[in-house]
Amino acid sequence: MSAPARPAPAAPIRVTAGTTAGQAVRDAGLPSRGAPDAVVVVRDADGRLRDLSWVPDTDVEVTPVAADTEDGRSVIRHSAAHVLAQAVQEMFPDAKLGIGPPITDGFYYDFDVAEPFTPEHLQALEKKMRKIVKDGQIFERRVFGSKDEARAELASEPYKLELIDDKSGADDPEVMEVGGDELTAYDNLNPRTRERVWGDLCRGPHIPTTRYIPAFTLTRSSAAYWRGDQNNASLQRIYGTAWESQEALDRHLELIEEAQRRDHRKLGVELDLFSFPDELGSGLPVFHPKGGVVRRELEEYSRRKHIEAGYEFVNTPHITKEQLYITSGHLEWYADGMFPPMQIDAEYNEDGTVRKPGQDYYLKPMNCPMHHLIYRSRGRSYRELPLRLFEFGSVYRYEKSGVIHGLTRVRGMTQDDAHIYCTREEMRDELARLLQFVLDLLADYGLDDFYLELSTKDPDKFVGSDDLWEEATETLREVAESSGLALVPDPGGAAFYGPKISVQVRDALGRNWQMSTIQLDFNMPDRFELEYTSSDGTRRRPVLIHRALFGSIERFFGVLTEHYAGAFPVWLAPVQVVGIPVADAHAGYLDGVAAELRRRGIRVEVDASDDRMAKKIVNHTNQKVPFMLLAGDKDVEAGAVSFRFGDRTQINGVPRDQAVEAIVDWVNRRENATPTAELVVLPSGDAQSPVAGEG
């Protein structure tokens, strides 16, 4: 278990008034351009990133930021996005600029152009970018004297004009063009003449020169709505990635290739797990029989563990009257994420006039308000607490079409939602118990590389007393630290109603996924007037804890599919065993073996198709079937089978009763490793002699 790799923080250095930050970096003997740990910007005492050309008015201490840090890579990628935009406008002079932010592992820039970009365009653009990088153009910050000055300079850039006029988006991390108290541009200067070659509206910061971009490539292009709103113009987006060294870029590209092979959307089709029919609409998946098996196993194991942990199962409807979400505050705080209302129960006169107005009903975006109604349905005593309500509840959220992504971002989902009501005195023990339950259950599914994130109060947006927030935050911190996992702070990242712990999981490719959340809520108990009778007879508010362990079943399914590259652990696999006869005459024998396995609860098929045996082995290997049992004349005579595994190894001549017991044992142990000839132990204890198979 580990947190994301982070370079050791750099020691602060002093910048003398009237000199540049870059001079202080050089005086300190720190790495410069060309090294993976070259300093690209500095961080001031307020946490703001500054260009190396920044000149402070007084002596200040700053922290150098290296290229191989998260912030350093982000600056390099932002500068690479500018180089891309310059190349596009040189190749396509009529192109209008959108925005070009750094993103996780890369960058993009949006353009309004007459035709979509082609792969040939990307090749030509990358070549032009390499020339700009080689030229060593200087990034120079310039402050506009006024909005009018900025408008005049950017009169031919309609999207930039919109950003100038709409500074409400200044704090949006994806809108790098505006921010702070100033409107600024970054000009690219010819290093020899210092003449302006190109420029862009931008708040920065940037690397000193284009040569500080050691390694980059363009990856793809796509359509994208301006500012992510489908009511706006459709632009063309070019994606790229940039890194601190060629070695780092090569590693990233290898990871991308492997991620593409593991893409759950691709595997969902190849393995016949799920699909997204156009007739249903965007973000609304259907699970096929094989996907249904995996989903059922996920849910049933979770259900059993929840029952053992003292949870009580509930069920709630998919729609509700408007008033519930007025009470909960969702219509005030979350209306943009909800589907439009349905008006129901109106009554009309014969002439069409309304005799009785209808009521607005909503698809539920969250299960919690309905769980609060269950809690409130009768009086509660402290003796009933903690009360742990759990539901596999379907919810519906309006996601913009541009952000929908396979199973990991959908509009219709099933959440494994729990709400825990406890006393303030029980809060710490319940949180500790809950966190351990979450970690143990995720590990049972094969995800066991964790770190934690603690989201704390936004001082400008919160409900409840400071004392309660402080107590709850410190309690969460103590619980997180006692787990022994790394804890990453997320200052100001909490929702307005309480602090939370997020469990971050690293998958087989080293990618981080936010998986489970444990959220304290000081708002809902008041809104719903939730109470319990304490030991002294007084009425008190319970502490409310929200918890979604998987996030959603759909998202967890997608993450597991990619983590295992579609080769699910045997206990989750849609088909656990397939019998492959050497010839048609051996199919009946394997039917008998299959019948024994079915009686023991194993999902098994016999391939009686007309394909040759070698073809069958290839087909079922591609379908990720974990156990293949082969049988020919010698096996039938000996009452045996031969094991064939996905890594091409075999165990030949295994007595059928031993084969059945070995498979049943593997499934019952919920072993997450992929079975191989080396790992499978036969009940007799005899040593196996694995052999390499053909084909």
Curated annotation (Swiss-Prot):
Which cofactors must be present for this protein to function? Zn(2+)
- Domain TGS residue range list: 1-66
Keywords in alphabetical order: Aminoacyl-tRNA synthetase, ATP-binding, Cytoplasm, Ligase, Metal-binding, Nucleotide-binding, Protein biosynthesis, RNA-binding, tRNA-binding, Zinc
Cofactor binding notes: Binds 1 zinc ion per subunit.
Q: Which domain of life is it from?
A: Bacteria
Major location, coarse class? cytoplasm
One Pfam family cited in the UniProt record for this chain: tRNA_SAD
Indicate whether Transit peptide appears among the record's keywords: no
Q: Where in the cell is the protein located? A: Cytoplasm
The family database entries (Gene3D superfamilies) matched by this protein are listed as:
3.30.54.20, Anticodon-binding domain (3.40.50.800), Bira Bifunctional Protein, Domain 2 (3.30.930.10), Threonyl-trna Synthetase, Chain A, domain 2 (3.30.980.10)
The molecular function GO annotations come to: ATP binding; metal ion binding; threonine-tRNA ligase activity; tRNA binding
Q: What is this protein for, i.e. what is its function?
A: Catalyzes the attachment of threonine to tRNA(Thr) in a two-step reaction: L-threonine is first activated by ATP to form Thr-AMP and then transferred to the acceptor end of tRNA(Thr). Also edits incorrectly charged L-seryl-tRNA(Thr).
**Official protein name in the record:** Threonine--tRNA ligase
**Organism source for this protein?**
Mycolicibacterium gilvum (strain PYR-GCK)
